Amino acid sequence: METQIQQAVEIALSGTADPALKSQAYEFIDKIKTSENGLQSCVTILLSSSSVTSEALRFFVLQVVEENIPKVSNERLYSINNSLLQFLRENYIVNHQSYPIYLRNKLASVMATLFCHVYLTINPQFLVQLLEYSSSPPGTDIYVRIHLAIHAEIGDKLIARSPQQQERNNALKDSIRANDMQRLVQSWRSILENAEAHTSDTLTNTVRVVGCYVSWMEISLFVVPDFIGVIFSYLRKPDQRTAACETVAEIISKKMKPENKLQLLALLNITDVVGSLAQDSDDLEFTESVARLANQVGLELLIVFEAQSDSTSEVMNQLMGLWPSVLGFLTHEFDDVAQLVFPYIQQYLLACKKQKTLINNDLLKELFAKCIIKMKFDGDDDGLDDDSAAQFEEIRAKLKTFQDTIAILVPNLYLDLVPAVISESLFSNKPDWQTSELGLYQLSNFADGVRNNLVGVPKKELTTSKAFAVLRELFIQLIDSSVVSSSGHPRVQLSFFELVVRHYTFVASGTNPDPILKVFGSSVGMFNESEKVRLRSWYLFFRFIKLVKPQMSNPSFVEEILLKLQPLLVIKAELPVRDEDDDVVDNGSFSSQLYLFEALGLLIGLMSVDDSTKLRMVDAIFSSLFSSLESCVAASESERNSQPIIPLQAHHALMAIGTFVRGYDDSNVKSGQVMVDKVDNAAQVVVITLSNFAKHEQVREASRFAFARFVPILRDRCTVHLSKLISLIINASNLTVTELSDFLSFLGQLVHTFKGNANVYQLLNDLLTPVVEKIFSLLKYNGENNDFDTMPDVIRDKNGLKKAYMNLLSAIIMNNSSSLLVTESNKAKLPEILSSLFEYSYDLADTTVAKLAVTQLINFVTVLGGSGGKINDPNDTYGESLPAIEGVDEYLIEKSMHLCFELPFQKTEFDLKDAQFRLIAQEISQLIKICYDRKGDTYLQYLSTYLTTMGMAPELMNDFGSSVVKLDNRAFKKYFITFVSQLKSA
């Protein structure tokens, strides 16, 4: 079998082997891994001295042995233990073999796994025997590697383990401490003391072993002067100094009493050591290790400081001695180094907030200055790489927390330094882009600090404080300066616009917005050569107008802006493209263009001028959009169907019209008659466009969007247009499920907006039945191949339509329009509507749909139950005048009663431990309560009869009926949950 294994491994690793043969080899290898004979053959191969045994084969047999160690009997483990120790003896003592590193590491891993399974009971002498094999350089190498692997198995805190594994590992550690600890430490010390006898790798790994084991071994074995001196000597050896740094960090991190920790740190003279190491290397990896060590030293000192009040002066002396190194790392040219001391800086500043004795103004001033230096883009950074800039912003955010904490600790220092930095960065002679950007960034931070009152001014005095006055003056100075207009760097330009939008309250309180609007409209803003800046500034221009809401009394200035922006308002649709992942993505800048239309709508609406002036400006915007739509409509039907760019152009123009009107309406200025007429004209244009593009979903979507924005302005005048719009959409032959869902939300908004409006009521009355029929038609349709019910996406969309449909019913009932459901035009659909609600309630495939259906049944029982089929809503204008619907009362109560008990008790998946089913049960309890509220004792009689047929005990039935009567809604929810739980578990 050994030969077969060797051949199988060779075939499996061959790049030229026949695929069928390779498949057979893999199958054979899998059998070897799981069979006793395979394990024995692998052990035999491992012990073979044959020179033909390849490294790949050795790796494979080691892998098989390792995988089987946890599975075999103790007797087999004993045999494997002896075989592996024999392998070590023959290869590392007798023959001094030198295998590749990956094979040595694999062997170490196998031995570590074996150790975990034999040390406690089968071979307590395991570590002693290992030590015997370390007499040669190769033997010492594998000896140390095995100890590293054992640490990975039992001591590595970064590896998650089960409670059983952790319990085993603790037992292994206890046994090592009791039996082998001193012997092990002495062996490591001996290796390090005799450096000339060992390879560089062996020494490095031994240093690492000390760092790994010190956390759970007796610290006194390591910190004796001779041994600690040996360890520290490796801090000066190029090959081992990085590992030595990590080991020293582990030593000082050892848990101990604060007074002992302070003695240890003093004994090691650790702050001086860190200081000398920090100045002694241009090796980045080592520098990072020293930075980690400095960070750990600082954290340990702070722990001692907080716990030892009588050692304050000594700790502070050591902290002060550490700070020069920390500040040096903070300003290191590589950010990865700087971040390594962030935890210590953060903890130090937090400690300052708790213990004022730690505050040292000179130190905090220097730290503050270093943070500012680190916040500046590097001189060789062009600032154009978004990924690297995003990483830098994360670092800045952490540095900002340090700045803010210093502001809280020493407000006067903050108020002196930050404005000076801002002024020097922004208003000095021709600063480079990095300096200007830093100034804008600091100004934004300063504004945040003032708004969040970091300097601790009484809230009522904030707007009259020195900080507020300084900030406002800086904003005025910035806006009056040429900092942005003279800068050609995109990051400076964007930073300015982001700044004035983010801190618009300060801008609005102390400056005239006109200069800012001019900058927006310049070549550094909305006409910027950089697409990123240009498109972002369009959005920020809109945000600025929306937030500041400038009261524009000078029409010529607004007309100047409008005229200047005309080139940007030209809509030219571009077909979507596919990205590198083959996903369809929008092409062009239309989505950003919409912000311009909304901003101009706002700006014109905010103007303090007569309507005729506003109308002139609106015409300037609408005329080009209407002209674009006219061109689209003029295209022949064949052109519209064959050239997708035409309906897309129509969609864009309609969206622009709707977005502009939304902006105008958001100005909260009451629209005069001329503006209402203009929007009414736009509504006509939309309907005409839709009638010509009724087959195109994107045009239907844009038309619906536009009308939703027209409604608040047109009010009653929109009904004629709405009737046509709704008919065109509902009658579209290719109406999709998701589109209808969105459309139902639009109808729900109409119901709410025009509650009590006779014209809209009549409109909805005429259209409700066709809408409901369309809903049921799309829900029923199962695709040409009758397979929609197997497609998750379709199921999800249909559930979305069910929710939208029920939300529309809810809107009708909650807005006192329930009579719509029982008018002569619509009452024929009522049975189908009610039947659908019961159907959805019983279907638990989507619990949110089921819960919503039960909620709607509560609504229907409220308005139609217990009143003989008449509408029970005094605020429904038409409810009283409509005749009763015979039988609906009894139907609702009887079907609801069946639902309330069949759903929780007959549906096996109804599990009250599931939060979703618990919510449904709570809704059912409210349905029971509302049925009782509407029918009173009659309902209790129905209930008694029904529960008797269910076989419920009289005592339990009486208790249930009593609870229905006596408990309020909240208490009955809890009762019903308990009731169902007890019965289901009985």
UniProtKB/Swiss-Prot annotation:
The keyword Signal does not apply. It is found in: Nucleus; Cytoplasm. Its main location: nucleus. The keyword Cell membrane does not apply. One of its GO terms (molecular function) is small GTPase binding. InterPro entries: ARM-like, ARM-type_fold, Exportin-1/Importin-b-like, Exportin-T_C, XPOT. One of its GO terms (biological process) is tRNA re-export from nucleus. Keywords: Cytoplasm, Nucleus, RNA-binding, Transport, tRNA processing, tRNA-binding. It comes from the Eukaryota. One of its GO terms (cellular component) is cytoplasm. Pfam families: Exportin-T (PF19282), Xpo1 (PF08389). Belongs to the exportin family. tRNA nucleus export receptor which facilitates tRNA translocation across the nuclear pore complex. Involved in pre-tRNA splicing, probably by affecting the interaction of pre-tRNA with splicing endonuclease. PANTHER family: EXPORTIN-T, EXPORTIN-T/LOS1. This is Exportin-T. It comes from Meyerozyma guilliermondii (strain ATCC 6260 / CBS 566 / DSM 6381 / JCM 1539 / NBRC 10279 / NRRL Y-324). The gene is LOS1.
